[in-house]
Amino acid sequence: MEFDSDYTNTIRAELLQKYIIRNMLDYVNIHTFTTTYENNPWEKICFLSLKEYSPSTKTIGYQHAVVTKASANMFISKEEMSYMPMPDKIVTVGGITEGVLRKYGCYPENRIHSSCALRHEYIYRLKKKNFTKNNTILVALEGVYECYKLVNFVFNALSDNKDYRVIIRTHPERPFSKIRNDLCFDIDSHANFSVSNQKPLKDDLSENDILIYWGSTVSLEALMMGIPVIHVSLDDIVNVDPLADCSHLKWTIRNVEELPTAITDVYDMPEHDFLSQYNKARSYIERYLEKVTDDRLSEFIV
């Protein structure tokens, strides 16, 4: 019933986009209409309405976030292309996501263009931290219900090892109060496990040696700062890792027995290997979230 209620309210609001667009055109002429591109219903309604009521308007969809192999909504089939409302141009945050959309979606050749990461300019201001070995580990969670599974995974892997201090950073959508009852342990009874007090992300990252994640985009910031990352694959049907095609300064594990070994491998990494891996990882992130420049901004001009 809750799903039905949410769906009903959502679809009503999205259908209103048609009338918003139509009424707006009574007052202004729209040369170019730019919106986010996540293949949401309301976006399609906007594109369809503009083609109906203002055929001369150019439409741009901005792919503004990460794209994983689990982002099925972003991968259009040949059959869908024949009838699905689409923007005239899709602009991406960088070359990596452009490549993912082209590889897994059946977009026309000239539809997708790589640009820059408008929402992630801050990432270029993050300072590289020294490679530290303080046995402190940050676990970054997403804002989805299943995020508690990662905490349980880490606990089952490290609860017997008191040498490591594990800090859990929750997502604003799923604060610790919402996941506590789903955990397999009482965090107050384990001194080596604690919850971040939601200090700025860069501070949490700076104070830890390693990041453990499932699908969190915090992994991109971590690599930019030179923090090794460990991706936990929680029996995923499809890959939710935003760094699926990056193997630099990154370890991927699938069972609890592998986590202590991965952590040891990180700490045993020679300094020259770390620097080499960091440079390759940073290069990957810079292609994923490309820097804002005048040339790249010109992709928003039709």
Can you describe what each PLM-predicted range is?
Residues 1-121, 219:
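Active-site and donor-binding regions of nucleotide-sugar-utilizing enzymes
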Residues 45-51, 104-105, 154, 178-189, ...:
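Short, aromatic/basic amphipathic alpha-helical patches
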Residues 102-114, 183, 217-287:
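Catalytic binding pocket for nucleotide-activated donors in carbohydrate/polymer assembly enzymes
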